[in-house]
């Protein structure tokens, strides 16, 4: 089974991202806008309970925090992904580090850059044009974060929530 671990921002932030994703992200229909804590990984069904238990432990060790989302960035020239930048807080860093050690042994493909994807798979010309236009706009949002989610991928490629983990001691 394929799993991923994400934070979903507020509906307002998701709506803003989806307004752009409809046009610029071919994965728009597969998963709502999110901040990836751990990229998708394969696991055996019998490992799921251990993963869930580990995520409850990680959530209990992490305090709720404020998510700051703003400005548009890009991963070019590595790939033509456009995103809303997410401020890297100590809590986000801790969550990401905890999800890449211990039970989670998958190698990182990229350094952790918290972000909210708004476009991908664009040609170089389209990427440059859209990035130029979006960088002139003013985006800034913040919201409290008190949970993250374990997702699994369905046969049709869409992602759905398996379990939600509340941050802070006594919340799980």
From Swiss-Prot:
Superkingdom assignment: Bacteria
Catalytic site: 34 (proton donor), 115 (proton acceptor)
Annotated Pfam families: 2_5_RNA_ligase2
InterPro entries membership: 2H_phosphoesterase_YjcG-like, Cyclic_Pdiesterase, YjcG
Short sequence motif named HXTX 2, residue ranges: 115-118
Keywords in alphabetical order: Hydrolase
GO molecular function: hydrolase activity, acting on ester bonds
Motif (HXTX 1) on chain: 34-37
E.C. code: 3.1.-.-
Family: Belongs to the 2H phosphoesterase superfamily. YjcG family.
Protein's name according to its UniProt entry: Putative phosphoesterase BCG9842_B4061
Organism whose genome encodes this protein: Bacillus cereus (strain G9842)
Lineage: Bacteria, Bacillati, Bacillota, Bacilli, Bacillales
